[in-house]
Protein backbone atom coordinates (compact mmCIF):
# COMPACT_ATOMS: atom_id res chain seq x y z
CA UNK A 1 0.00 0.00 0.00
CA UNK A 2 1.32 3.38 -0.99
CA UNK A 3 1.32 6.20 1.46
CA UNK A 4 0.78 9.90 0.87
CA UNK A 5 3.74 12.01 -0.18
CA UNK A 6 5.38 14.16 2.39
CA UNK A 7 4.99 17.91 2.09
CA UNK A 8 8.62 18.30 1.00
CA UNK A 9 8.27 15.72 -1.77
CA UNK A 10 5.04 17.33 -2.98
CA UNK A 11 6.70 20.75 -3.15
CA UNK A 12 9.66 19.31 -5.07
CA UNK A 13 7.30 17.70 -7.59
CA UNK A 14 5.41 20.98 -7.96
CA UNK A 15 8.64 22.87 -8.63
CA UNK A 16 9.67 20.36 -11.28
CA UNK A 17 6.27 20.69 -12.94
CA UNK A 18 6.58 24.48 -13.00
CA UNK A 19 10.09 24.32 -14.44
CA UNK A 20 9.09 21.93 -17.19
CA UNK A 21 6.10 24.11 -18.15
CA UNK A 22 8.30 27.20 -18.32
CA UNK A 23 10.85 25.45 -20.49
CA UNK A 24 8.24 24.40 -23.05
CA UNK A 25 6.81 27.86 -23.71
CA UNK A 26 8.91 30.36 -25.65
CA UNK A 27 9.09 33.83 -24.16
CA UNK A 28 6.45 36.16 -25.53
CA UNK A 29 7.52 39.44 -27.06
CA UNK A 30 11.16 38.52 -27.39
CA UNK A 31 12.53 38.35 -30.85
CA UNK A 32 15.91 37.19 -32.03
CA UNK A 33 18.75 39.62 -31.85
CA UNK A 34 19.32 41.55 -35.03
CA UNK A 35 22.52 40.58 -36.77
CA UNK A 36 25.42 42.97 -37.05
CA UNK A 37 26.02 44.65 -40.36
CA UNK A 38 29.48 43.64 -41.66
CA UNK A 39 29.74 46.92 -43.60
CA UNK A 40 29.33 49.10 -40.52
CA UNK A 41 32.59 50.86 -39.58
CA UNK A 42 34.36 49.65 -36.45
CA UNK A 43 34.27 51.95 -33.48
CA UNK A 44 37.37 54.09 -32.89
CA UNK A 45 39.69 52.87 -30.12
CA UNK A 46 40.21 54.93 -26.98
CA UNK A 47 43.60 56.38 -26.05
CA UNK A 48 44.28 53.38 -23.83
CA UNK A 49 43.69 50.92 -26.67
CA UNK A 50 45.96 52.94 -28.96
CA UNK A 51 48.57 52.63 -26.20
CA UNK A 52 47.85 48.89 -25.88
CA UNK A 53 48.69 48.28 -29.56
CA UNK A 54 52.17 49.65 -29.01
CA UNK A 55 52.61 48.10 -25.58
CA UNK A 56 51.75 44.58 -26.81
CA UNK A 57 54.64 44.67 -29.28
CA UNK A 58 57.09 45.79 -26.60
CA UNK A 59 55.79 43.25 -24.08
CA UNK A 60 56.10 40.36 -26.56
CA UNK A 61 59.69 41.34 -27.36
CA UNK A 62 60.63 41.47 -23.69
CA UNK A 63 58.60 38.39 -22.66
CA UNK A 64 58.38 36.01 -25.64
CA UNK A 65 57.42 33.02 -23.45
CA UNK A 66 54.51 34.78 -21.73
CA UNK A 67 51.41 34.11 -23.87
CA UNK A 68 48.83 35.15 -21.25
CA UNK A 69 46.48 37.88 -22.43
CA UNK A 70 45.65 38.69 -18.82
CA UNK A 71 49.32 39.30 -18.01
CA UNK A 72 49.69 41.68 -20.95
CA UNK A 73 46.53 43.56 -19.97
CA UNK A 74 47.57 43.79 -16.33
CA UNK A 75 51.04 45.09 -17.21
CA UNK A 76 49.61 47.59 -19.71
CA UNK A 77 47.09 48.88 -17.17
CA UNK A 78 49.80 49.39 -14.55
CA UNK A 79 52.00 51.17 -17.07
CA UNK A 80 49.12 53.38 -18.30
CA UNK A 81 48.32 54.44 -14.73
CA UNK A 82 51.93 55.38 -14.11
CA UNK A 83 52.14 57.58 -17.24
CA UNK A 84 51.77 61.33 -16.80
CA UNK A 85 49.32 63.40 -18.85
CA UNK A 86 52.13 64.61 -21.09
CA UNK A 87 53.18 60.99 -21.76
CA UNK A 88 49.57 60.08 -22.61
CA UNK A 89 49.15 63.09 -24.94
CA UNK A 90 50.33 61.39 -28.19
CA UNK A 91 47.95 58.48 -27.60
CA UNK A 92 45.07 60.84 -26.82
CA UNK A 93 45.81 62.85 -29.99
CA UNK A 94 45.90 59.71 -32.14
CA UNK A 95 42.66 58.47 -30.55
CA UNK A 96 40.95 61.82 -31.29
CA UNK A 97 42.13 61.64 -34.90
CA UNK A 98 40.77 58.09 -35.24
CA UNK A 99 37.50 59.19 -33.63
CA UNK A 100 37.06 61.98 -36.20
CA UNK A 101 37.67 59.50 -39.01
CA UNK A 102 35.16 57.13 -37.45
CA UNK A 103 32.54 59.88 -37.14
CA UNK A 104 32.94 60.69 -40.84
CA UNK A 105 32.73 57.02 -41.79
CA UNK A 106 29.66 56.37 -39.65
CA UNK A 107 27.94 59.49 -41.04
CA UNK A 108 28.57 58.26 -44.58
CA UNK A 109 27.41 54.78 -43.60
CA UNK A 110 24.19 56.09 -42.03
CA UNK A 111 23.55 58.38 -44.99
CA UNK A 112 24.00 55.50 -47.43
CA UNK A 113 21.88 53.21 -45.29
CA UNK A 114 19.04 55.70 -44.97
CA UNK A 115 19.00 56.49 -48.69
CA UNK A 116 19.12 52.78 -49.52
CA UNK A 117 16.26 52.13 -47.12
CA UNK A 118 14.24 54.95 -48.67
CA UNK A 119 14.97 53.87 -52.24
CA UNK A 120 14.01 50.22 -51.79
CA UNK A 121 10.42 50.84 -50.60
CA UNK A 122 10.02 53.61 -53.16
CA UNK A 123 10.87 51.20 -55.97
CA UNK A 124 8.37 48.68 -54.65
CA UNK A 125 5.68 51.37 -54.46
CA UNK A 126 6.45 52.50 -58.01
CA UNK A 127 6.18 48.94 -59.26
CA UNK A 128 2.85 48.53 -57.46
CA UNK A 129 1.62 51.82 -58.91
CA UNK A 130 2.64 50.74 -62.39
CA UNK A 131 0.84 47.42 -61.98
CA UNK A 132 -2.27 49.12 -60.66
CA UNK A 133 -2.22 51.75 -63.37
CA UNK A 134 -1.85 49.07 -66.07
CA UNK A 135 -4.73 47.15 -64.60
CA UNK A 136 -6.88 50.19 -64.18
CA UNK A 137 -6.28 51.31 -67.76
CA UNK A 138 -7.31 47.97 -69.18
CA UNK A 139 -10.19 47.66 -66.75
CA UNK A 140 -11.36 51.14 -67.58
CA UNK A 141 -11.20 50.37 -71.29
CA UNK A 142 -13.07 47.11 -70.76
CA UNK A 143 -15.68 48.81 -68.62
CA UNK A 144 -16.13 51.59 -71.18
CA UNK A 145 -16.64 49.02 -73.91
CA UNK A 146 -19.17 47.13 -71.79
CA UNK A 147 -21.04 50.27 -70.77
CA UNK A 148 -21.18 51.46 -74.34
CA UNK A 149 -22.63 48.17 -75.54
CA UNK A 150 -25.21 48.18 -72.73
CA UNK A 151 -26.20 51.72 -73.56
CA UNK A 152 -26.56 50.74 -77.20
CA UNK A 153 -28.83 47.90 -76.14
CA UNK A 154 -30.86 50.24 -73.94
CA UNK A 155 -31.27 52.68 -76.79
CA UNK A 156 -32.65 49.95 -79.02
CA UNK A 157 -35.47 49.13 -76.62
UniProtKB/Swiss-Prot annotation:
It comes from the Eukaryota. InterPro entries: HMG_box_dom (IPR009071), HMG_box_dom_sf (IPR036910), HMGB_plant (IPR031061). Keywords: DNA-binding, Nucleus, Phosphoprotein. Residues 41-110 bind DNA. Expressed in all tissues examined. The modification Phosphoserine is found at residue 149. SMART domains: HMG. Gene3D superfamilies: High mobility group box domain. This is DNA-binding protein MNB1B. It is found in: Nucleus. GO terms for biological process: regulation of DNA-templated transcription. GO terms for cellular component: nucleus. Residues 10-27, 76-87 have a biased composition (Basic and acidic residues). It comes from Zea mays.
Amino acid sequence: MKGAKSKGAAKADAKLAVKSKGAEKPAKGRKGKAGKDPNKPKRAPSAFFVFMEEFRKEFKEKNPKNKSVAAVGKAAGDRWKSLSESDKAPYVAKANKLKLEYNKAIAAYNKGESTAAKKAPAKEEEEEDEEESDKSKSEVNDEDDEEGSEEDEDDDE
